[in-house]
């Protein structure tokens, strides 16, 4: 995952890149935990580049817009995704569950239980209840 500082243009995330920071998402990190890390790095990248932006002394890197995708907020209906019937303990299922864990807005309901954390260990999904 990562954060990118871009020069704003008329598109969505289509402007040239000023700077970026990449980081590894750990196997058991929830969407909400990842969001908080993204916010931390967003602040860091902004502070790092603030003075050079004010002075107009920064380099721009054009991006290949053919490699990008955009999904609008309305393209995902979370209410249809959060009720999960867990039948198999797979990494794919674990990733799906943890992608929906965002306590300010929703928690996935797995086999009837609100889940605040999913841990994948020894090919098993361990669910922590709300």
Language model: regions and residue ranges:
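Internal anion-binding site segments
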Residues: 62-130
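Donor/substrate-binding cores of folate-linked one-carbon enzymes
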Residues: 1-71
